[in-house]
Amino acid sequence: MTFKRRNGGRNKHGRGHVKYIRCSNCAKCCPKDKAIKRFQVRNIVEQAAIRDVQEACVHDGYVLPKLYAKVHHCVSCAIHAHIVRVRSRENRRDRRPPERFRRREDRPQGPRPGGGAPAPGGAAAPAPNVART
């Protein structure tokens, strides 16, 4: 019979059995090696109160610690939450990890289409005065 994935959707090579975990979203039982695992990094203090806490802090430059929680998702919840995406038959063979998300200021700034200089006669140039006689 044909098979869809080389690993059968699991990371269990050579093991007979692995323990089950509960999905963090729906509490469904899922094998630990099949579950989609991610670290959720959050601030201890919510975004609205960060400045108030830093102003009230005695130490200058104190960095608030973060909460690191490992979340496990079953396949259906991971697809629904766009943590993983359904890929075509050809793209399923691609075993490279997906491209990492980079913040806007970390991206390389290359030449943009249309050039960086303002066009002559654009919005910044004053309109010619034709009413003179």
From Swiss-Prot:
**Iron among keywords:** no
> What ranges does the record give for the region Disordered, renumbered to this chain?
87-133
Enumerate the transmembrane spans. none
State the UniProt keywords alphabetically: Ribonucleoprotein, Ribosomal protein
GO biological process, any: translation
Q: Does the keyword DNA repair apply?
A: no
Compositional bias, Low complexity, is annotated for 120-133
Per its UniProt record, what InterPro entries does this chain match? Ribosomal_eS26, Ribosomal_eS26_CS, Ribosomal_eS26_sf
Top-level taxon in the UniProt lineage: Eukaryota
GO function term, MF aspect, one: mRNA binding
Per UniProt, the ranges with Basic and acidic residues bias are 87-109
Recorded GO cellular component terms are:
cytosolic small ribosomal subunit
Family statement drawn from the similarity comment of this UniProt entry:
Belongs to the eukaryotic ribosomal protein eS26 family.
* Protein name listed in UniProt: Small ribosomal subunit protein eS26
